[in-house]
Amino acid sequence: SLNKCIETKEDFSQELIAKLYESGEAGIPVETFFPKEEIKGNNYYILKNGSNSVLACYDPVRKVVRKVEKLNTFGIYPKNSEQAFALDALMNPNISLVALSGKAGTGKTLLALAAALQQNKAFEQIYLARPIVALSNKDLGYLPGDVNEKVSPYMQPLFDNLAVIKH
């Protein structure tokens, strides 16, 4: 879960926050930020000092801490730091699996679909899946109607998200 990879650091060095803004995507060597801490790859940070803050990520490939930009994908903008981190992880070709968890309606599916469609040339297929738990573990075969009538209401939230992305 991405939430387990997010850490807020209060009273962080104002100088390092400024350097991170200046460095952009290039980043700053991890030892500069966390000299005595062992950190895991692709951890995300909210670094704060008073009213100043920056969203950051540890890139284990380049061994730098870099500023996380609020990406725009198909006109979809992150509304908060968690969505910015999620979209950053979803768009990072060095991260092969991203697990997003959270309450319904927080944008997980929309961000995942937008990121997948943005990168569609990198993949042969995009699979949309939903957990069967939402059906109270009922077998679809026992529901009345043909396969489209059975699956359509269940898949409608995915189609709704695709419609938002399309327009």
Locations of regions flagged by a protein language model:
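Conserved glycine(s) of the Walker
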Residues: 105-107
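Short, basic, glycine/proline-bearing loop/turn elements
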Residues: 71-73, 102
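Interdomain "pre-motor" coupling segment immediately N-terminal to P-loop NTPase/helicase cores
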Residues: 2-69
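Walker A (P-loop) ATP-phosphate-binding motif of ABC ATPase nucleotide-binding domains
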Residues: 97
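Conserved P-loop
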Residues: 110-167
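N-terminal pre-P-loop "Q-motif" helix
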Residues: 75-94
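Short acidic (Asp/Glu) and glycine-rich catalytic loops that position anionic groups and cofactors
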Residues: 65-70, 94, 132-141
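Hydrophobic anchor at the beta1->P-loop junction of P-loop NTPases
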Residues: 100-102, 112
